[in-house]
């Protein structure tokens, strides 16, 4: 009997133990990452040929303590390598693990290689050659703390390499994991199986091979035992012949069918090729079809199983499309596949929750470094009184109500950009803004007392409901997370897409960028203030301080201003402002753009203006400014400097976003100025619920 070890992906150890026991293995012991077992030579070959779950089958050769590199060398050399393989066989060493002595795996592999080679040369035998690509013998050494475990890898290449798959395309899951997913799905061979996002077909091919009794090792051309001195070719040929006979019989007797679809035609062609190479191509029908086109191939029965490894995303901007996909999949399952079973494997449990289905079972597994979950569902049969499932119903109803009220108003006003929802319901704490055909959802960062997982799931529900209610494509929805901005973060780029969209606001055309920055380039709550500036500016010299993207300058220019001067510290925003001005035919000497610290520029400037708009930050301590600025503390100093630039009879429109801002009216009077608050006049219908989003004042000479 041989002592053997079968490695596997984390989470599959018990499943592998059952498989090995069914093959005839004895004394199976589960450890993390694999199973120790006993078996004769035939069982060695049976496990290599038939295990669908093992990553590798190892023959342990011994262990040694490693306190120095010499210990490693001597421990390896103590093994009788000349009885394990012949000198004309090539070999390779795979070394993993480090300790205080062996700090580099390549160095460890070199010491092992030297020990093996010297074991031959000291017996006056030829030196065996190293072949890293396709060796006859693979030696595996695993160093754990101060113990090195040495084994012969009888698999050669990993057992997930079945020999049927085109290796040019990256696969999201290995064949061994795919087989485990099929086994855990609850699917019964002989019943229909469908994968609506099949990719290169791995799940369906593994299922078909299992169902038709086709050994996973049948198509492999190279093994790690080919140079092993104990290899018994006669027994191996018997095992191989038996596998071929069973495969032919299984294929001839199998009557059910498999269905696979994917939106990518190239991937589907690869799946067809893989299935043909696996010998089960005739059993699987592949179609180019996305989830939106999915229908039940057997509406009159029998019931089957839907299985898939749907895509998931690591980037925030990919989530709307994935949420839409999972929501659509859930609806399609309920509408088209009543009575069927569903099994999905994913690295994102949150996305699976978007199905709006309750799982009967779930399993955990690792896919490489990713923690994944497999959830199994039973899809209830549809009855005449079945109600369609809803997601975030209260939010969806409020959004519909707001749209009904605001869409007509926006058309009458001549605006394309407006707020549809602003945390109307406390549990759905987001803002939803429309920009023409696009929608931006801004999530207000939840307080630390709110469970992060629940908040994330609530956000996913909001996205799914928004897509349903507005009937927009997922690629037209942009997701942002808004929290208190500190220092430079309010100006930092989120992406580098550089996608600008042209929108209309009254008679102005403006560029917005929905993806690259936290803000879009257009503060929607200032819309009426900008229109007022346009109406006030005819024949006047207009100054726009802290100008952002210059939209107020555009309105002033279109309103007939004699000149506009646009000042901001950011070159990016000034270039954006220039684009906005040009888009409206406003260019030349009459429309100046100045990059400067606005407060410093204001102290030095000596020009005169009839109309000044200033919308300073609530607080700023930028390194490019000489000192910090607090709008509550410093607004009188600001007014003193502005008064110096204000032409007789001129007006300052002053706005800020500080909640609870108190204008120092006595201080203004001492400066010879008076203020009229116009906040309520500048709040439009879409901001009617948020009366404190900004405050706005007209300031003139007393």
From Swiss-Prot:
<dbReference type="InterPro" id="IPR029063">
    <property type="entry name" value="SAM-dependent_MTases_sf"/>
</dbReference>
<keyword id="KW-0949">S-adenosyl-L-methionine</keyword>
<comment type="similarity">
    <text>Belongs to the methyltransferase superfamily. RlmKL family.</text>
</comment>
<keyword id="KW-0698">rRNA processing</keyword>
<dbReference type="InterPro" id="IPR053943">
    <property type="entry name" value="RlmKL-like_Mtase_CS"/>
</dbReference>
<dbReference type="InterPro" id="IPR004114">
    <property type="entry name" value="THUMP_dom"/>
</dbReference>
<dbReference type="Pfam" id="PF01170">
    <property type="entry name" value="UPF0020"/>
</dbReference>
<keyword id="KW-0694">RNA-binding</keyword>
<comment type="function">
    <text>Specifically methylates the guanine in position 2445 (m2G2445) and the guanine in position 2069 (m7G2069) of 23S rRNA.</text>
</comment>
<keyword id="KW-0963">Cytoplasm</keyword>
<dbReference type="InterPro" id="IPR019614">
    <property type="entry name" value="SAM-dep_methyl-trfase"/>
</dbReference>
<dbReference type="InterPro" id="IPR000241">
    <property type="entry name" value="RlmKL-like_Mtase"/>
</dbReference>
<dbReference type="InterPro" id="IPR002052">
    <property type="entry name" value="DNA_methylase_N6_adenine_CS"/>
</dbReference>
<dbReference type="GO" id="GO:0005737">
    <property type="term" value="C:cytoplasm"/>
</dbReference>
<keyword id="KW-0808">Transferase</keyword>
<dbReference type="Pfam" id="PF02926">
    <property type="entry name" value="THUMP"/>
</dbReference>
<dbReference type="GO" id="GO:0052915">
    <property type="term" value="F:23S rRNA (guanine(2445)-N(2))-methyltransferase activity"/>
</dbReference>
<feature type="domain" description="THUMP">
    <location>
        <begin position="43"/>
        <end position="154"/>
    </location>
</feature>
<dbReference type="InterPro" id="IPR054170">
    <property type="entry name" value="RlmL_1st"/>
</dbReference>
<dbReference type="InterPro" id="IPR017244">
    <property type="entry name" value="23SrRNA_methyltr_KL"/>
</dbReference>
<protein>
    <recommendedName>
        <fullName>Ribosomal RNA large subunit methyltransferase K/L</fullName>
        <ecNumber>2.1.1.173</ecNumber>
        <ecNumber>2.1.1.264</ecNumber>
    </recommendedName>
</protein>
<dbReference type="Pfam" id="PF10672">
    <property type="entry name" value="Methyltrans_SAM"/>
</dbReference>
<dbReference type="GO" id="GO:0070043">
    <property type="term" value="F:rRNA (guanine-N7-)-methyltransferase activity"/>
</dbReference>
<dbReference type="Pfam" id="PF22020">
    <property type="entry name" value="RlmL_1st"/>
</dbReference>
<dbReference type="GO" id="GO:0003723">
    <property type="term" value="F:RNA binding"/>
</dbReference>
<keyword id="KW-0489">Methyltransferase</keyword>
């Amino acid at each position: 009997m041989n002592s053997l070890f079968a490695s596997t992906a984390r989470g599959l150890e018990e499943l592998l133990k059952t498989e090995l026991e069914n093959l005839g293995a004895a004394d199976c012991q589960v450890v993390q990452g694999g199973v120790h077992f006993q078996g004769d030579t035939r069982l060695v070959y049976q496990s290599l040929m038939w295990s669908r779950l093992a990553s590798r089958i190892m023959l342990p050769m011994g262990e040694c303590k490693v306190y120095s590199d010499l210990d490693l060398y001597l421990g390896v050399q103590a093994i009788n390598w000349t009885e394990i393989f012949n000198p004309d066989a090539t070999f390779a060493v795979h070394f993993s693990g480090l300790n205080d002595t062996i700090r580099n795996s390549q160095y460890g592999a070199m010491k092992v290689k030297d020990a093996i080679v010297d074991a031959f040369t000291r017996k006056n035998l030829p030196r065996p050659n190293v072949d890293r690509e396709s060796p006859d013998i693979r030696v595996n050494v695993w160093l754990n703390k101060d113990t090195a475990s040495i084994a012969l890898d009888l698999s050669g290449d990993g057992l997930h390499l079945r020999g049927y798959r085109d290796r040019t395309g990256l696969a999201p899951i290995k064949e061994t994991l795919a087989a485990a997913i099929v086994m855990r799905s609850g699917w019964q061979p002989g019943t229909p199986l469908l994968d609506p996002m099949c990719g290169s077909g791995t799940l369906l091919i593994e299922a078909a091979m299992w169902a038709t009794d086709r050994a996973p090792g049948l198509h492999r051309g190279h093994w790690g035992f080919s140079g092993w001195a104990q290899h018994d070719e006669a027994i191996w040929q018997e095992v191989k012949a038996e596998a071929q006979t069973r495969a032919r019989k299984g294929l001839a007797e199998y009557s059910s069918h498999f269905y696979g679809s994917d939106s990518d035609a190239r991937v589907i062609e690869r799946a067809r090729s893989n299935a043909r190479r696996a010998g089960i191509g005739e059993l699987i029908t592949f179609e180019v079809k996305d989830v939106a086109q999915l229908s039940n191939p057997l509406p009159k029965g029998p019931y089957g199983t839907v299985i898939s490894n749907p895509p998931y995303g690591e980037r925030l901007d990919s989530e709307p499309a994935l949420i839409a996909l999972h929501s659509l999949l859930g609806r399609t399952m309920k509408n088209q596949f009543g009575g069927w079973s569903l099994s999905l494997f994913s690295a994102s449990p949150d996305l699976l929750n978007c199905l709006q289905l309750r799982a009967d079972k779930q399993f955990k597994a690792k896919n490489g470094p990713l923690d994944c979950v497999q959830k199994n569902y039973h899809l209830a049969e549809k009855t005449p009184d079945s109600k369609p499932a809803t997601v975030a119903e209260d939010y969806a109803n409020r959004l519909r109500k707001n749209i009904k009220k605001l869409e007509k108003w926006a058309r009458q006003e001549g605006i394309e950009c407006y707020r549809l929802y602003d945390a109307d319901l406390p549990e759905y704490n987001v803002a939803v803004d429309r920009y023409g055909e696009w929608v931006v959802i801004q999530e207000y960062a939840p307080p630390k007392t709110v469970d992060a997982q629940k908040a994330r799931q609530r956000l996913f529900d909001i996205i799914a409901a928004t897509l349903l209610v507005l009937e927009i494509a997922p690629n037209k929805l942009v997701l942002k997370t808004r929290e208190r901005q500190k220092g430079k973060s309010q100006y930092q780029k989120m992406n580098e897409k550089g996608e600008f969209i042209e929108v209309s606001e009254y008679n102005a055309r403006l560029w917005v960028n929905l993806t690259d920055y936290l803000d879009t380039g257009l503060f929607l709550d200032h819309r009426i203030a900008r229109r007022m500036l346009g109406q006030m500016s005819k024949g006047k010299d207009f100054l726009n301080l802290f100008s952002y993207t210059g939209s107020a300058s555009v309105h002033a220019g279109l309103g007939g201003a004699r000149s506009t001067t646009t000042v901001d510290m950011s070159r990016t925003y000034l270039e954006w402002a220039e684009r906005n001005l040009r888009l409206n035919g406003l260019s030349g000497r009459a429309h100046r753009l100045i990059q400067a610290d606005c407060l410093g520029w204001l102290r030095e400037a000596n020009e005169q203006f009839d109309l000044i708009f200033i919308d300073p930050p609530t607080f700023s301590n930028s390194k490019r400014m000489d000192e910090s600025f607090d709008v509550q503390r410093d607004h009188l100093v600001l007014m003193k400097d502005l008064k110096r630039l204000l032409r007789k009879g001129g007006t300052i429109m002053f706005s800020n976003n500080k909640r609870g801002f108190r204008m120092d009216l006595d201080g203004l009077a001492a400066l010879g100025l008076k203020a009229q608050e116009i906040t309520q006049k500048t709040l439009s219908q879409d901001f009617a619920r948020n009366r404190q989003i900004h405050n706005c004042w007209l300031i003139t000479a007393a």
